[in-house]
């Protein structure tokens, strides 16, 4: 599916998309690649060849977001960076119950601490960027940043934290020429939501509340990320943009 009729030119722009090997992250990485950016991605498998899709167009780094040393190594390996997309995330880690304190803690470590560590590790390279409109960090929030989803209390707490982290990084790093924003997807087709798709009891309450009445796709989310990273958004920072088919206003 064509992501949008709006064309962005990111020629020469260096982009890192964490979790860019699948789902929303893969859609974002593809969109930057089509816009002529130099795109690196992370994934949990040892190499790009371990995936069932062709990732040869990207620089690939194996990374788990709970590994602080690996986060630093990935950041240090980059020659330069203009845009960081903190997309990597996981709910119900390993299929376990997030109401168990250890699992809750792991979910927060993956979805909040990992994004903060990666942002901090990349700060100096982003501050050195000459990208028109300034360097950007785009965080992935969620509807669970704002609404209760009782099955994933750790994930929801982490994603709520992402919204506030976005504001604080934006305020603190604006003098360094770094803009920090977030997008908050609604119900989007991905590996994370695969078990819900087509199961009426699970998806119907969300679709009934979504005015646009359908699942979103990674191609719905990617254009919002490219906009926030572009010079068209040069005076926008600290904001979280819902990309949810109207779920948050219904």
Regions found by a protein language model. Give the residues of each.
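Short C-terminal tail/terminal secondary-structure segment
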Residues: 2-6, 147, 226, 237-250
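Substrate-binding pocket helix/loop in short-chain dehydrogenase/reductase
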Residues: 95-108, 206
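Active-site loop-to-helix junction immediately N-terminal to the catalytic Tyr of the SDR YXXXK motif
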Residues: 99, 148-156, 168
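Active-site helix of classical SDR
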Residues: 119, 158, 166
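Residue(s) in the substrate-gating loop at a strand-loop-helix junction
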Residues: 142
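Short, small/polar-rich loop/turn modules that mediate ligand/substrate recognition or access, typified
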Residues: 174, 179, 236-238
